[in-house]
Amino acid sequence: IDELTNLKNRTALEDDIKDDDFVSIALIDIDSFDDINELYGFSTGNLVLIEVGKILNEFSLKYDVSVYRIYGNVYCLADKKMMGFFKFNELIEELAVLFKNKPLYIEQLDIDIFVNITLGISIAQEESIKTAGIALKKAKKNNLPYFVYNNDIDTKEMIEKSMYWREKIKKALKNDKVIPFYQAIFDVDKNI
């Protein structure tokens, strides 16, 4: 059990789905949570985590799914009953709307903190936590409210390319093989 939110934790999720190869899950990430911590402090950030956990717990009862706090500001909804793609998609769309600029009243500060979420969805995939994580990363990268994992995402190849170019650039910088080119910027009067 997660001590802060009293929700099940990642270990419980892994135990709950270990025998179910094709469970559907949604990873839920609170957008710009670091900004909340920096602006209001960690204790207020914790209050936001607790409130989001309460909302997700109530939401999970409506759809008969399980809710978990995985780590930090990431939660998970898991459907082990195989409600199907369309029903799970309906759940996701409703959740995305529910958290669109969701005001959370923080009584201790007498303020509303507005929260948005991004979701990564894995529907009936093997390694559902991993594939939902890939989908979450893709949603965040493309500034989407949610993304549903599909097998067309070839992340291994993408990661290999990224690693290749990262090493190539590091080596070029280290060996002083980078030649910078500059172009002067002029205003309309041709002043630099």
Which residues fall in each region the model found?
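Active-site core of bacterial EAL-family cyclic-dinucleotide phosphodiesterase domains
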Residues: A12, D16, E160-I192
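Conserved long alpha-helical elements within nucleotide-processing catalytic cores of c-di-GMP signaling
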Residues: I1, T5-S24, D31-E58, Y68-L77, ...
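A short linear hydrophobic-aromatic micro-motif
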Residues: Y63-S66, F181-Y182
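Short glycine/proline-enriched coil/turn segments at helix->beta-strand junctions
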Residues: K18-S24, K62-D64, S122-E127
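A structural signal for short, well-ordered beta-strand segments
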Residues: I25, Y75, V115-I121, Y182
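Short catalytic/binding micro-motifs of nucleotide second-messenger systems
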Residues: E58-D64, E94-I111
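Residue-level recognition of strand-loop junctions within catalytic nucleotide-signaling folds
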Residues: A78-M82, K100, A124
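Cyclic nucleotide signaling catalytic output domains
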Residues: E94, E107-I111, N116-K168
